[in-house]
């Protein structure tokens, strides 16, 4: 098998010129679209992931109605910063609902964790060697472009993340069985975010393996569930830079390549659960930059996130 990353290309895309002008469907068309829709969970990791998921909610609301799609599509966003993103739908600002779609996994007491690391087995095993090199600050406004802070935030808030993922997956699985009785349709999972920062880049692989582990609870239906990843590269952030943009991206892609090609993931989580898997975390992974096929750069990260949201909708 060849190197996984050698087969990947930054996905070119046309600007979503009609993103803000997509008309609402009539009721018959909306119902037909819903009946064709496979149960889908879209997970946003970090601020970029939250933007994508919010824009997707705007599209779903505009095209299918404010509530009609929620039995078939679940949206979750996990971020370490308390930021609100809005998308337009029928002249109305659409936002993710706090504590139902949008979850804050920040407010991590890093100094206290450092002092009590001996009693925190899951965190010590994953991050014990690197924690002393990190700034002893309470994470209240993002992961400081530090990937270990992203993973630490997920582990510190593990119960919240695990429970919300499980609730969404079981809702979609149960709903699908109730509607059609056909378990072979399975569930589509999309995990999206940037590879350049701390939260998304530090959590996307663990999120995928947590979802894989939760799939096993579905029995035979798990065979028909698929995970797709979407990661944004530094070029998707025109005019924005940071000292860790390139190192974070390189580290994230190296870890992704290792797990996709060689597989083999083992980690203990704070509830004592050990996930040991030989499966690749994703069935498919797309990397997205900020340049289209003509070599023109997208205007800003918001435009790129809108493009990704439209791709997910279509």
Regions from the PLM with identified roles:
Residues 1-314:
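Tubulin/FtsZ superfamily GTPase core signature
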């Amino acid at each position: 098998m060849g190197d996984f990353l050698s087969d990947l290309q930054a996905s070119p895309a046309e600007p979503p010129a009609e993103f803000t002008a997509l008309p609402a469907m009539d009721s018959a068309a909306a119902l037909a679209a819903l009946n064709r829709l496979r149960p889908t969970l879209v997970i946003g990791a970090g601020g970029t992931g939250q933007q994508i998921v919010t824009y997707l909610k705007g599209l779903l609301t505009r095209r299918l109605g404010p509530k009609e799609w929620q039995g078939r599509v679940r949206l979750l966003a996990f971020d370490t910063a308390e930021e609100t993103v809005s998308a337009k739908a029928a002249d109305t600002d659409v936002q993710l609902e706090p504590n139902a779609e949008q979850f804050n996994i920040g407010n991590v007491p890093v100094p206290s964790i450092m002092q009590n690391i001996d009693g925190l087995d899951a965190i010590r095993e994953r991050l014990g060697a690197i924690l002393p090199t990190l700034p002893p600050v309470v994470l209240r406004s993002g992961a400081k472009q530090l990937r270990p802070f992203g993973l630490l935030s997920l582990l510190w808030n593990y119960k919240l993340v695990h429970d919300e993922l499980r609730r969404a997956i079981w809702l979609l699985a149960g709903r699908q069985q109730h509607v059609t009785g056909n378990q072979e349709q399975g569930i589509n999972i999309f995990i999206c975010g940037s590879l350049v920062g701390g939260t998304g880049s530090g959590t996307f692989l663990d999120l995928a393996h947590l979802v894989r582990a939760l799939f096993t609870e579905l029995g035979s239906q798990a065979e028909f569930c698929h995970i797709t990843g979407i990661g944004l590269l530094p070029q998707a952030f025109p005019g924005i830079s940071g000292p860790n943009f390139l190192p974070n991206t390189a580290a994230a892609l190296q870890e992704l390549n290792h797990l996709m090609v060689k597989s083999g993931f083992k980690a203990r989580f704070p509830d004592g659960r050990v996930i040991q898997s030989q499966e690749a975390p994703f069935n498919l992974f797309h990397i997205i930059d900020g340049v289209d096929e003509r070599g023109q750069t997208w205007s800003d990260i918001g435009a790129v996130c809108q493009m990704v949201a439209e791709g997910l909708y279509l």
